[in-house]
Regions:
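Flexible, glycine/threonine- and acidic-rich loop/arm segments that mediate assembly and lattice contacts
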Residues: 1-272
Length: 272
């Protein structure tokens, strides 16, 4: 919901007639669904005989495949470049990731740019920029931009493992040592990292993501306005038998929904 600009001089004469304010029509932004899928096939014999460490082979393989699909969905979510693609009879639909949906508060470097996204799905590719070092100043600017554009406080910083280590080295983020015991044989614990950052515009929980290992982007997020929208959840469908085996199709039809881009930010063109 986009509000008009704040006006401290909003006033009227007592008893005066009025004219209606101009109304801005709602513009809908969206995304495209992506059908994540995997198949499992098990022979009749393999599903019956005893196996080391598990029972029915089919149950084991279905569970494993679902974990793989969940990881694929995570990769889509944190992708800095994956755009939305509309489904056709010959093209599979694709959900845009965070990188193309966080258009309100992007921090690029050089020629880097994120295309404007005001309606429809985010289908425009990211423009590459020049990499630079992830710094505390960039993070503080991202938090301030979120507050300025949305009035919301950021709550989460999602980064690559390398950028998490770099964050912990920011000046003033973490003290070097902290006593955890008292008494004669007290020991000190070396603190080599930090998981929470209190900025001027909100406290951030810092989360490293293993699927972002080579990413050049850090996400500053407000999870209240981000959803993973499923059409019908994870579905398991038994396929027709064509021989001495059982076959299963597993699908997850979903899309990433960033419902308030102004409450999010990204810092990109970072040295991985």
């Amino acid at each position: 919901m986009a509000l008009g600009a704040a006006s401290a001089s909003n006033k009227m004469i007592d008893g005066d007639d009025v004219t209606l304010d101009a109304q801005v029509a709602t513009v809908r932004i969206g995304n495209h669904l992506q059908i994540f899928n995997g198949t499992v096939g098990v022979s009749r014999r393999a599903n019956i005989v005893k196996k080391a460490g598990r029972g029915a082979e089919m149950a084991y393989l279905k569970g494993k495949k679902m974990l793989e699909l969940k990881r694929n969905i995570e990769a889509m979510i944190v992708s800095p470049t994956q755009v939305a693609i509309a489904a056709t009879t010959s093209v599979a639909g694709q959900s845009g990731g965070l990188g193309v949906q966080l258009v309100s508060n992007p921090l690029h470097n050089g020629a880097g740019a994120t295309a404007a996204w005001t309606s429809g799905a985010p289908t425009a590719a990211i423009t590459a920029g020049t990499n630079r070092t992830f710094t505390k100043a960039l993070l503080d600017t991202a938090c301030q931009n979120i507050y300025t554009t949305s009035g919301q406080f950021a709550e989460m910083l999602v980064v690559s493992p390398a950028h998490k280590a770099l964050f912990s080295a920011f000046a003033s983020v973490a003290q070097n040592r902290m006593d955890v015991k008292s008494g004669k044989n007290a020991q000190a614990t070396v603190v080599g990292g930090a998981d929470v950052y209190l900025s001027d515009f909100g406290g951030l929980t810092v989360v490293p993501h293993y699927l972002m290992a080579s990413s050049d982007t850090a996400y500053v997020l407000n999870s209240d306005y981000i959803d993973l929208a499923f059409l019908d959840g994870f579905k398991t469908t038994d396929l027709a038998k064509t021989g001495d085996s059982d076959k299963v199709l597993i699908t997850a039809d979903c899309a990433l929904a960033v419902r308030a881009p102004t409450a999010q930010a990204k810092i990109t063109n970072l040295t991985p």
